[in-house]
Amino acid sequence: MFHGRRILLIIGGGIAAYKSLQLIREFQKKGATVVPVMTRGAAEFVTPLSVAALSKNKVFKDLFDLNDESEMGHIELSRSSDLIVVAPATANLMAKMAFGVASDLASTLLLATDTPVLIAPAMNVRMWEHPATQNNVKILMKNGIHFSGPEEGDMACGEFGFGRMSEPEAIVKAASEILINGPLRNKHILITSGPTHEPIDPVRYICLLYTSPSPRDVEESRMPSSA
């Protein structure tokens, strides 16, 4: 479902920004085109040159860059993509999204779009648990923003708890669930697996203990149909 799709990847200014490099690779493996946008803080953790080299696309950074605006204005940039992914989504960026603040290119893009948005929060556990952040989460969910994570684990600061950015593979999976719009959308399928028992008479049966990969294959194949 990613072939021919255009992903606008907004990279926030957090230590988890390094994961965005792997995220770009994962999207490309699926056939997607990744157009990167970096906040000023993101450039402190990963270089725009690295992001441009991996994505094979220009990195957009500045709202008031005349060259960027002449090539593709921020309005068109926000609307020419099939999905906007914010990873990492810092507490600051989430707060801007919740209250409609458009103070830089990233936040302006997010305010000027009607494209589906998926965010992957990443911050210190205390920042994530703070009432202000939790209120922002509620606002964003109410506004239709999709979430991937955060996950629980060790922090770069040495603390433990929720606030780790989801792994790139998990973000790609969440993105695929948003993009698919197949004929079985909103339909539920029950997939069973394990050994089978087939009776041959009232007292005997044939048992197959081997579990093939078929159930897993069926589970993966149902995704393009949105079931």
Question: Can you describe what each PLM-predicted range is?
Answer:
Residues 116-151, 163-170:
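Short, glycine-/small-residue-rich phosphate/pyrophosphate-handling segment
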Residues 210-215, 227:
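Conserved small/polar residues in nucleotide/adenosyl-binding loops
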